């Protein structure tokens, strides 16, 4: 790669498109003749107001977001959203969660602070290596919403068919597949995504919420900042937002629009993932962690024959220019995160490396 860059398979913060980084670098000292960097710019300035409004407009175009949905840029990332969702949506104090891995478990633990949580399906019995059947969930009449983690970054599963929520509001953590494929926003009540995986710099989440779910009658204990209405009423400018992340995300939105949109991204991501999964399924040395029908196209966990060899593979890969292949500490093994910005040649080069490693160790 140019600039002595490595192929970065990190689950997040993750790769950004090289052309986007070049554009950001060209503007970092003096943005569009303003005489200052976006990092130095007042969030109330007309220049930044234009950055913010254009970023939202481009995201709406990319995702075909209906007019009755608000787009919010909220500081804090996913951990804050684990709390904001139940704080804002638990009107009856009951919510249903599908337990599919590490991140849905964290969301469940946080939601239990604010009300009753019913786990309506789980794949914990097989170490989250598959997605449970969600076609006939036992959803109580008084449930406020059904929550899923649409792509489990650590465990490597992804929904390819949405659950039947029986008319209840669907809430989805889309962090690690956000903007990787087309999305019918109208099927959801709320979508949120930490941006550091597939969009831009860490420290922010994008929230897409249907307007009728933005409540004013929240319990008094809900802080002002943690109310979706606060951000919706202020157009994401209630306080100083993460200006730099908004700006960088906006650049990525423009990149996606000029490179075929989400339909083109979905095709490229399918091609990339197929290269890696086909190798893993043929390998006599490496093993894919997830059953075929539930595999993520973004996060690919896999194992070598032993923990010691997992560590050796990751170290050897790093030395060869393939960085951040070590699996998450909670599950071990190896993991290749191949988000939008990872070029197909990066995945092909990784497969060539793994083939060579296998040949030398079998």
Map each language-model feature to its residues:
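Conserved PLP-binding catalytic core of the aspartate aminotransferase-like
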Residues: 286-317
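N-terminal "arm"/small-domain region of PLP-dependent enzymes with the aminotransferase-like
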Residues: 1-42
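PLP-dependent enzyme catalytic core of the Aspartate aminotransferase-like
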Residues: 1, 6, 319, 328, ...
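Conserved active-site segment immediately N-terminal to the catalytic lysine
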Residues: 171, 185-196, 205
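Active-site phosphate-binding strand-loop segment of PLP-dependent enzymes
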Residues: 111, 122-178
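Conserved PLP-anchoring active-site segment centered on the Schiff-base-forming lysine
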Residues: 90-105
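Active-site C-terminal subdomain of aminotransferase-like
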Residues: 195-277, 291, 360-362
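Conserved N-terminal alpha-helix of the aminotransferase class I/II PLP-enzyme fold
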Residues: 33-81, 88, 102, 110
